[in-house]
């Protein structure tokens, strides 16, 4: 899969990947059907890791604009899930991640299954989870492949960027979708990249203004669909 940020003349891609989504751009390059289809996983061990019902979460990301920047969001979600009788399993690579003066921690109350572990282990956790709650990140794609319902929290990407999930959270009343804006060039070296509102009170408002109540509504819909 090729992501060509500066291909203004469409030499390497017939349409800009930001307009068609990460998982469709290769299809456009190859000239095949761009309809999305989750890959099928064949795990050598398909057994459950714990007997109780549980939810997987992943809160970390490679850049701050991907995070859910609501300061109390994850804490409130974990508390809500535990009240519903779920164990909450965090399957990030790291329990803490960030840069300079900005660091993001595993939410209080979540069980720590972070670490440099095989993706097959992550997939096994996801396969038996009631659902997954996470960001526009690799573990969300792995959950999709595992056949697990995904509650996604993302504001810096437009929904076209990822696979479809009925449980996506985005706030259309704030700045949003800068990643999919051809006018903005993502800076892989700026962890605090926010092209429209950097160093202003509006920085990262795309996810900061996604409320826990909004996410809980999507979680409730996922729970209802499972019942």
For the regions a protein language model found, what residue spans apply to each?
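Catalytic machinery of carbohydrate-active enzymes
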Residues: 1-227
């Amino acid at each position: 899969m090729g992501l060509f940020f500066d291909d203004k003349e469409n030499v390497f891609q017939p349409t800009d990947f930001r307009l068609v989504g990460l998982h469709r751009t290769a299809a456009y390059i190859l000239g095949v059907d761009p309809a999305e289809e989750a890959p099928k996983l064949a795990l050598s061990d398909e057994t459950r890791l714990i007997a109780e019902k549980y939810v997987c979460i992943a809160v970390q990301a490679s850049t701050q604009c991907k995070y859910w920047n609501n300061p109390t969001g994850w804490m409130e979600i974990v508390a809500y899930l535990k009240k519903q009788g779920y164990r909450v399993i965090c399957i990030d690579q790291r329990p803490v991640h960030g840069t300079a003066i900005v660091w993001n921690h595993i939410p209080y109350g979540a069980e720590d299954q972070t670490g440099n572990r095989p993706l097959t282990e992550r997939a096994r956790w996801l396969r038996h989870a009631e659902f997954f709650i996470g960001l526009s990140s690799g573990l969300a794609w792995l959950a999709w492949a595992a056949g697990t319902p995904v509650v996604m929290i993302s504001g810096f990407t437009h929904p076209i960027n990822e696979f479809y999930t009925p449980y996506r959270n985005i706030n259309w009343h704030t700045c949003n979708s800068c990643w999919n804006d051809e006018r903005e060039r993502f800076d892989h070296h700026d962890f605090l990249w926010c092209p429209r509102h950097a160093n202003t009170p509006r920085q990262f408002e795309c996810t900061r203004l996604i409320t826990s109540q909004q996410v809980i509504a999507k979680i409730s819909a996922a729970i209802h669909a499972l019942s």
